[in-house]
Amino acid sequence: MKLLIILRGAPGSGKSYFVKQNNLEDLTLSTDKIRLMYSSIYIGKDGRDYITQRFNKRVFELLYKMLEIRMQNGDTTIIDATNTKQSSVSEYLRLAKIYSYTPICIDFSSIDYCRLLEQNKSRASYKIVPEEVIKDMCENLESSKQWFINTFKNNYYDYYEYYGNYAGVGALKNIGIDMFCYNLEKKYLCK
């Protein structure tokens, strides 16, 4: 099965942590990593380090091009971005349809707001997002719940609820992406 796995959630919700902890970087297209390809970290007026949002249009154009190439190759791909807007997800779904991919959303929006703010503060300085931005994104996530594909609710504190006796998601690479896909297919696609 050709899978497109779309991670969705506010900054600091654990999307990139999920990818890193499970050694899935080689399957992942990350908007933050693409932003850092376009521009170095910059120092804001407040003296803090930031990843610039100035090139967002270019970032997403490149993301879509890279995604299409991966789909032409038949590669399972994970999209690591907030994915709070229908417009960005619509392009993923358009490509998934063209290349016969099964799109799945792993939704990190169930993370408690206070925990989200704590996790945001514990990130690398350049990845810390202003609280008002997180609040706006949480509102966007709430207003757009269940507006697209098969959604897998994820709270990385509750992996065992979803993965039973497979040693949790931490063992994804050991189990292999095929087992991951099998479990998602069995639990969420074969309803």
Regions flagged by a language model, labelled:
Residues 34, 81-83:
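Conserved Walker B
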Residues 41-42, 83-127:
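ATP-dependent NMP and nucleoside kinases share a basic, alpha-helical "lid"
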Residues 2-8, 13-17, 21-27, 98, ...:
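Conserved GTP-binding G-domain of TRAFAC-class P-loop NTPases and closely related GTPase folds
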